[in-house]
Design a protein with these regions (language model features):
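Residues within alpha-helical segments
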Residues: 41, 59-64, 97
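A glycine-rich, Thr/Ser-enriched phosphate-binding loop motif common to dinucleotide/cofactor-binding enzymes
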Residues: 49-63
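Intrinsically disordered, low-complexity polar regions and short flexible loop motifs
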Residues: 43-46
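Generic structural signal for well-ordered alpha-helical scaffold segments
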Residues: 63-71
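Active-site-adjacent bridging/hinge elements
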Residues: 32-38
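Generic hydrophobic secondary-structure packing signal
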Residues: 36, 54-58, 88-91
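Glycine-rich phosphate/dinucleotide-binding loop and adjoining beta-alpha-beta core of small-molecule
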Residues: 1-31, 71-140
């Protein structure tokens, strides 16, 4: 099975954040969420790449970019990682762990218990490292 990513590129909304000295304004959307889910599913089911490997690779790429574009200029900055309940939350826990391993100050705010096995595993790994997870109050 092959996938075609549309050539039409759209400027990503993150580029409008205006963070000083970064290249997020150059970030472009290459595919939509539905296409990305299909690519992930294909990698897992047809190629045999475990979901945890995909999460780890995504987290490493994000962590490298964050370090290069923002944290290298302000290494003492607290990084707050907001994790949802799905696989993006799992990516967040993996990114938080990688940032902590690189000696950055990190805290995680999580929407609740993970709904997927891989996301839950990354949450457990984060907690086994002795790190805490903040759950926002329902009153917020």
């Amino acid at each position: 099975m092959s996938f075609r990513i549309e050539k039409e590129l759209t400027t990503h909304p993150l580029g409008k954040l205006g963070l000083p000295g970064n290249s997020l304004d150059k970030l472009q959307l290459l595919c939509d969420a539905r296409t990305m889910r299909e690519l992930d599913r294909n990698a897992i089911e047809n190629i045999g790449i475990p979901g945890m490997v995909l999460m780890e690779n995504a987290a490493r790429s994000f962590t490298d970019l964050l370090e290069q574009e923002i944290l290298s200029k302000n290494p003492d900055q607290l990084v707050v990682v907001c994790c949802g309940k799905g696989n993006n939350g799992g990516d967040g826990f993996a990114s938080a762990r990688q940032l902590a391993n690189r000696n950055y100050r990190v805290t995680v705010v999580h929407a609740g218990e993970a709904k997927t096995e891989d996301a839950f595993k990354n949450q457990q790994i984060w907690e086994q490292f002795g790190e805490s997870v903040s759950f926002p109050s329902s009153d917020a």
